[in-house]
Amino acid sequence: MAQTFFFYDLETSGLNPRQDRIMQFAGQRTDMDLQPIGEPYNILVTLNDDTLPSPDALMVTGITPQKTVEEGYAEAQFARMLSEEIFTPDTIAVGFNNIRFDDEFIRHLFWRNFYDPYEWTWKDGRSRWDLLDVVRLTRALRPEGIEWPIDDKGEPSNRLELITKANGIEHENAHDALADVTALIAVTKLIKQNQPQMYDYLLKMRDKKLVQKLVNVDDKKPFVYASGRYDKEFAKTTVAFPLTTSRNG
C-alpha cells in the first residue's frame, strides 16, 4: 500500500490530555505530493457531563459543551473511526506541535476506549511527523524563499497563523481545526517547494532509527537540534552533543 499523509488538528477542552477531552477533530489525507485524497474530516466529539471546558478553550474555539452534544460523535464511536478509517496502515500522521500535544490526546482517547494507545504511530508502516520542528529547523538553517514573521513584541515567532499571513496564505478562522489543517498543508507545500532537500531530509528523520544513528553515545558527534526549550534568539535551534543515555535508553 502506498504511503499517505494525514494532516490533522484538534481543539480540546483544555491542555491536560489526562483530564481534558477532544471537542473538534479535523483532518485531510494527501498523497506524498501533498495533493488531497478524498474529502476532509471535520467533526465534533460529544463532551461527557463531567467534563468542564476551561474558559480559555471556550473563548479560543467558540465550541460549547451544548454544541458537542447536539452535533458530536460519541467518544467511543470517534475512537473506532480513528482506528478503522483514519490512522490506517502506511499513514504518516502530521500535525503542528502534535508530538507534544495532539498525539497525547489521541493516545489517551484510545486508552480510555480500550485501543492500543501506541500502535497508530508505528505499526504496519504507520509513523508521525511534527511540522513545528520542521519549521524551526528550516527557519534556522534554510530560511531562503520563505517570509519569517515577527510578532507584535518584535520577536521571531513560528505561530502558524503568523507564518501564513507573512506568506500570503489564506487562513481565516485560526483555531478552527479544519482551517488550521488547510493552512498547515499550505505551509508544508511552501517548505517543500522552496527547500526540497531540507524537506526530504527531515521527512526521513521521523524514523527513530535514523535519529539514533545521529545521537549515538558509542560514536559521539555533534548534531543540530531544534526544541521549544531553546531561545528565540537562536531560532529555537542549537548544536548539541551526546553525553550519555537517559534511563529510558
Region spans (language model):
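Flexible, charged surface loops at secondary-structure boundaries
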Residues: 1, 86-88, 247-248
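N-terminal accessory regions of nucleic-acid-interacting proteins
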Residues: 1-4, 209
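A generic secondary-structure signal
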Residues: 14, 81-85
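Short hydrophobic beta-strand that contains or immediately precedes a catalytic carboxylate
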Residues: 7-9
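Metal-dependent phosphoesterase signature
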Residues: 60-81
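Short acidic, Gly/Ser-rich segments with clustered Asp/Glu that frequently serve as metal-coordination loops
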Residues: 11-18
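Acidic two-metal-ion nuclease catalytic site recognized across multiple nuclease folds
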Residues: 189-249
